[in-house]
Amino acid sequence: MQDNLPQIWEKTLNLIKPELTEVSFTTWIKSIEVISLEGNTMILGVPNVFTKDILTARYATLISNALKQTTSKNFEIRFIVPSEEKISKTEESQKKLEGSVNISVASDQFVSNNLNPKYTFDTFVIGNSNRFAHAASLAVAESPAKAYNPLFLYGGVGLGKTHLMHAIGHFILQNNPKAKVVYVSSETFTNELINSIRHDRNVEFRNRFRTIDVLLVDDIQFIAGKESTQEEFFHTFNALHESNKQIIISSDRPPKEIPTLEDRLRSRFEWGLITDIQPPDLETRIAILYKKAQMENIDVPNEVLTHIAKKIQSNIRELEGALIRIVAYSSLTNSEITVELASEALKELFSSKARQLNIDLIKEVVANKYNMKIEDFNSKKRTRSISYPRQIAMYLSRELTDLSLPKIGEEFGGRDHTTVMHAHEKISKDILADDNIKEKIERIAKEIKGD
């Protein structure tokens, strides 16, 4: 029977298809891959954990019954995510290895394995908001260390910075499979540094990051205020740059606006090309949704894609999340995808966004916390009871909105952008130095966001 599994599965699919809507069949069933037959258990591969959970909860019985009709036998169904199975086996092997030898930070299995296979240049949707960043990324991928070094990408959350970084890594590896490409978040870099210090393996750590061809570091802003991490990254940067190796960095803001970042790092980040990514316009948002639906092999009416794109303007992650939510809702209710269904599926999402997060709201919440008048934020008063809450409000405006420094300055009585930058840097330092201040500002931020 093992040899006949493809034919058996084909017949099973033909029995299942009439029982479901086209959307449900395409979304959940079509992506299933027959892996093997182990006794009376059919092993079926699925693309991700979310799909696995849905299939287990809603469709396992349907599939089992269809298999019984096809083969006249009872089968247990087990869904697996093949990529996760491989990872768990690798981790198990690594644990066994670590049990018999000293743990080493260095590895020939470079972090290129961490590159998301979906994040390539082919799947990146180009629009006016990201055209220059895309062109710069492609130039770097085509000629590592010759075009722009470093390449510094910045922009808000979920706008495509990580996608472009992964795409660069994939492109380089495709053209040179032997290239040593490391993709790492700044948090991971910090954690690995801490572990290397704890276990006295600094040499291995440095070898890992300084003997490579391409280093991609995501969310570099999180090393701000971490002296040891900045020190190590400074020397790593120098070693790679002097060896003519490519460095790509991403952040949520340009180098000059990252608080408590050492000047020597700031200047090095500015050696190459700095390019930003802005929120996508309506046409680009529709194109992104169309591309996502195409990749997932889902048929979604154009009017629904337009409806989503008009409602969600913030970032790509939320756009794609809304599309997945609508498809899941359609499948779970066994209904066709329409604008009405989309509105119903997303009503909770939209209602939670009803309270507009803007500077007026930030001023209102901060003013209530510090017993001050709203107009005091725009006044010239410099007493600490006024100036410090004003700095907190400026800090939160920078952290919680996408407004530029000059625009924030305008909202606070026409102040210069350097005043906003100073306020942000001061509060950032206070947060690092004083846990009470950190907790208080976190509480204010949660209240502003409605958490």
Curated annotation (Swiss-Prot):
Region: Domain II, residue numbers: 73-113
Entry GO terms, CC: cytoplasm; plasma membrane
Cross-referenced InterPro entries: AAA+_ATPase, Chromosome_initiator_DnaA, Chromosome_initiator_DnaA-like, Chromosome_initiator_DnaA_CS, DnaA_C, DnaA_dom, DnaA_N_dom, DnaA_N_sf
Keywords of this entry: ATP-binding, Cytoplasm, DNA replication, DNA-binding, Lipid-binding, Nucleotide-binding
A GO molecular-function annotation: DNA replication origin binding
Major localization class: cytoplasm
UniProt-annotated location(s): Cytoplasm
Gene3D superfamilies in the cross-refs: 1.10.1750.10, 1.10.8.60, 3.30.300.180, P-loop containing nucleotide triphosphate hydrolases (3.40.50.300)
Keyword check for Disulfide bond: no
Organism domain of life: Bacteria
Chain segments carrying region Domain IV, binds dsDNA: 331-451
Region (Domain I, interacts with DnaA modulators): 1-73
Region of interest: Domain III, AAA+ region: 114-330
The keyword Nucleotide-binding is assigned to this record: yes
Binding site for ATP: G158, G160, K161, T162
Subunit relationships: Oligomerizes as a right-handed, spiral filament on DNA at oriC.
HAMAP family with a match to the protein in the record: DnaA_bact (MF_00377)
Domain-related comment: Domain I is involved in oligomerization and binding regulators, domain II is flexibile and of varying length in different bacteria, domain III forms the AAA+ region, while domain IV binds dsDNA.
Cited function: Plays an essential role in the initiation and regulation of chromosomal replication. ATP-DnaA binds to the origin of replication (oriC) to initiate formation of the DNA replication initiation complex once per cell cycle. Binds the DnaA box (a 9 base pair repeat at the origin) and separates the double-stranded (ds)DNA. Forms a right-handed helical filament on oriC DNA; dsDNA binds to the exterior of the filament while single-stranded (ss)DNA is stabiized in the filament's interior.
Family from the record: Belongs to the DnaA family.
Protein name as it appears in the record: Chromosomal replication initiator protein DnaA
Gene: dnaA
